[in-house]
């Protein structure tokens, strides 16, 4: 029986950051793109994930406000490696979405980097992607999503 796979729901447009990039640079990426998670990549390998929630948690709430002080602006200079999640749970593109969902629930994560056979990132699957698939297909394993290949 055919099942919905991660490669039918994952985002393949990857925007990555490096561990030595600043939170200011990450903020610009989040402002420019409609992502909630960025992969932190070094030498073509995923070394971490940073989310928009991580960014908000580590930036001063006064950045960009009239009451901003030097120490508030300094939070923009913090490095990604200081705040990223390091224990990254990854997945393969040919994994079914039920297993992806179990991995997210078991590990308490909201995204899974999708890696190829060389362990290089080729996409990201998020809880939103999985929820959209269920909303569109229900539990029908033969369902085809509008943007899926095959």
List the model feature ranges, each with a label:
Residues 30-33, 38-54, 104, 112-128:
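A glycine-centered beta-loop-beta connector
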Residues 13-16, 45-46, 90, 120:
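Short, flexible active-site loop motifs that bind/organize anionic cofactors or intermediates
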Residues 1-13, 51-89, 96, 101-105, ...:
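Tandem CBS (Bateman) regulatory domains
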Residues 37, 44-45, 66-69, 76-78, ...:
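Short, surface-exposed, polar/charged, turn-prone segments marking secondary-structure boundaries
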């Amino acid at each position: 029986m055919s099942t919905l796979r991660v490669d039918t729901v994952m985002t393949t447009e990857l925007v990555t950051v490096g561990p030595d990039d600043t939170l200011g640079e990450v903020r610009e990426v989040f402002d420019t793109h409609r992502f909630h998670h960025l992969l932190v990549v070094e030498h073509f390998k995923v070394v971490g994930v940073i989310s928009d929630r991580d960014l908000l948690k580590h930036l001063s709430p006064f950045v960009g406000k009239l009451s901003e002080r030097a120490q508030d602006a300094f939070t923009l200079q913090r490095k990604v490696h200081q705040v990223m999640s390091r224990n990254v749970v990854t997945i393969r593109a040919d994994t079914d979405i039920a297993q992806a969902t179990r991995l997210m629930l078991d590990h308490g994560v909201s995204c899974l980097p999708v890696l190829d056979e060389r362990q290089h990132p080729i996409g990201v699957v998020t809880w939103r992607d999985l929820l959209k698939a269920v909303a569109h297909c229900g539990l029908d394993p033969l369902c085809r999503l509008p943007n899926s290949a095959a």
